[in-house]
Design a protein with these regions (language model features):
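Solenoid-repeat scaffolds in large eukaryotic assemblies
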Residues: 53-54, 73
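Amphipathic, coiled-coil-like alpha-helical segments
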Residues: 1-7, 24-32, 38, 64-79, ...
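Extended low-complexity intrinsically disordered regions
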Residues: 1-19
Length: 145
């Protein structure tokens, strides 16, 4: 889970879970929906070469990501937001953000996978060594044993 620790600061995630209580799963669902929309808007703005249209979805994703401890995702969104603002002021399009947008999409997907794993017990991987308990009496029901 080294990678998970690098993508999500679980202390912030758990703090948010504790603060929101029973509403946590619903709010996490909003994060997923808003995040998907923000990533799609950022990609559309890149295709349209519209620097101004990058700012709000990047800003939104930055703030929501930090709320759940997804700092690497927030950092990429912040870079996109800051560079887009600069480019709006300069009257140019930030082509240099293409790798950041690709990274943003990948990080968002990885973050959502980790959040799902942390909140849905069915998605948790089984412990190594098989399933169930080891039976102590293995001769039960066998002839001659």
């Amino acid at each position: 889970m080294d990678n998970a620790a690098n993508i999500v600061d679980w202390r912030y995630f758990e703090d948010t879970r504790n603060q929101l209580g029973p509403g946590f799963i619903k709010i996490l669902g909003y994060f997923r929906e808003d995040g998907e929309a923000s990533v799609a808007k950022i990609e559309a703005a890149m295709h349209a070469k519209d620097a101004a249209a990058l700012v709000i979805p990047a800003h939104t994703l930055k703030g929501e990501s930090r709320q759940f401890g997804a700092e690497p995702l927030a950092a990429v969104a912040e870079r996109i937001e800051d560079e887009a603002r600069r480019c709006v002021e300069q009257g140019r399009f930030p082509d240099e953000l293409i790798p950041d947008v690709v990274k943003l999409k990948q990080l968002f997907a990885a973050t959502i996978d980790l959040f799902d794993e942390a909140t849905n017990p069915r998605l948790k991987k089984p412990a190594a060594g098989g399933f169930g308990r080891k039976v102590a009496n293995t001769s039960f029901g066998r002839a001659g044993g």
